[in-house]
Design a protein with these regions (language model features):
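A short, N-terminal "cap"/entry segment at the start of jelly-roll beta-barrel domains
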Residues: 1-50
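Short histidine-centered beta-strand/loop micro-motifs
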Residues: 25-27, 46-53, 70, 75, ...
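A structure-centric signal for secondary-structure junctions around beta-strands
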Residues: 32, 55, 101-102
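Structural motif
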Residues: 65-67, 74, 90
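Short acidic-glycine-tyrosine-enriched beta hairpin
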Residues: 72-87
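Ligand-binding loop in jelly-roll beta-barrel domains
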Residues: 88-111
Length: 111
């Protein structure tokens, strides 16, 4: 039987970043689920690049705004909005706010 040992940890989802690229911070990885905080300051997916992940993804915008593009159109996300992206749903980030920075909470999982 596999056991996971967790220790009490504290963090702040709104800790400022000073980077020139998106910042990805893994908060939890356990079995079939992982949670990340992503901070984007005006960053977008490279031209022609599409995510095609083998995991489902729940993503919520905690601060700022963003726009995702799928093969079926664009989805605007403002602070408090979330979207559930099925595995292998091709998508890309076409906009993120820079002031304030876009802070995402992403939960990934496998069936």
């Amino acid at each position: 039987m596999r056991r996971y040992i967790y220790i009490l940890q504290k963090g702040n989802l709104f800790t400022p970043v000073t980077r020139t690229d998106d910042e990805f911070v893994e908060i939890l990885k356990s079995g079939q689920v992982r949670i990340e905080r992503i901070v984007s300051e005006g960053h977008v997916s490279p031209p022609g690049f599409w995510y095609d992940q083998n995991e489902w993804e729940y993503v919520a915008v905690l601060q700022g705004s963003a726009e995702l593009e799928t093969l079926n159109g664009k989805i605007r996300l403002d602070s408090g909005d979330w979207v559930m992206i099925p595995a292998h749903e091709k998508h890309r980030v076409s906009y993120t706010s820079s002031e304030p920075p876009c802070v995402w909470l992403a939960v990934f999982g496998k069936e």
